[in-house]
A protein has these predicted regions:
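N-terminal interaction/assembly modules
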Residues: 1-88, 135-150
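N-terminal positioning helix adjacent to the helix-turn-helix/winged-helix DNA-binding module
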Residues: 78-81, 92-94, 125
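Short, conserved sequence motifs enriched in acidic/basic residues, glycine, and aromatics
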Residues: 88-89, 116
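Short amphipathic alpha helix immediately N-terminal
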Residues: 89-106
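DNA major-groove recognition helices of helix-turn-helix
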Residues: 122-136
Length: 150
C-alpha cells in the first residue's frame, strides 16, 4: 500500500505506531472499499478519460475526507487517549492529513485543476475537520467532568 493510495496510514504510523499496530487497530486493509478509498482511486483514474464530472470528484473527495476523519477519531477513542491529546494532537493530526498532505504533496494548482474547485473550498474542508475535532474534545471533557461527580 503506497502513501498515494492511502496517506493516512503513513501519517499515523509515523506519529504513533508501527505499521502492524495500525493495521490491527484500524484494519484499513480490510476496509478500503467500505471507506470508499478503492472506489476513489478507480474513479479518479477513469476521470482522466472524461467519464466523471467535477461534481462527482468533489463529492468523492469530501466523502473520503469525512471517512478518514471518522476513522481517526474512532482510533483515538479506542485507545483512550487523554483529553489533552485528543484536543491538541488531534488538531495537528487533522491538519497534517486533511490539509497539508493534499496541499503540499498534490499542490494547490493540481488540486484545483483536478477537482475544479478553489482554495476557499479546500480551506472549508479543512475547517470542517478541525471543527469536528473540537466537538469531539468537548464531549470527552464533559464525560470526564460528569464521571468525577459520581
Amino acid at each position: 500500500m503506497t502513501e498515494k493510495q492511502f496517506p493516512v496510514h503513513c501519517w499515523l504510523s509515523r506519529m504513533w505506531d508501527t505499521e502492524a499496530q495500525i493495521e490491527q487497530k484500524i484494519g484499513y486493509r480490510d476496509k478500503l472499499n467500505s471507506w470508499g478509498v478503492g472506489q476513489y482511486d478507480a474513479e479518479h483514474v477513469s476521470s482522466r478519460t472524461g467519464e466523471n464530472t467535477s461534481e462527482t470528484k468533489y463529492l468523492e473527495y469530501t466523502v473520503l475526507s469525512e471517512e478518514i476523519e471518522k476513522k481517526i477519531t474512532e482510533y483515538l477513542y479506542q485507545n483512550r487517549r487523554t483529553e489533552a491529546v485528543i484536543g491538541n494532537v488531534t488538531n495537528n493530526l487533522y491538519r497534517n492529513i486533511l490539509f497539508d498532505w493534499y496541499i503540499n504533496h498534490k499542490k494547490w494548482n493540481e488540486l484545483c485543476r483536478t477537482y475544479n474547485y478553489g482554495k476557499s473550498q479546500l480551506y472549508s474542508i479543512r475547517q470542517k475537520a478541525l471543527d469536528a475535532v473540537a466537538r469531539s474534545s468537548r464531549k470527552v471533557k464533559q464525560r470526564k467532568t460528569t464521571s468525577s461527580f459520581r
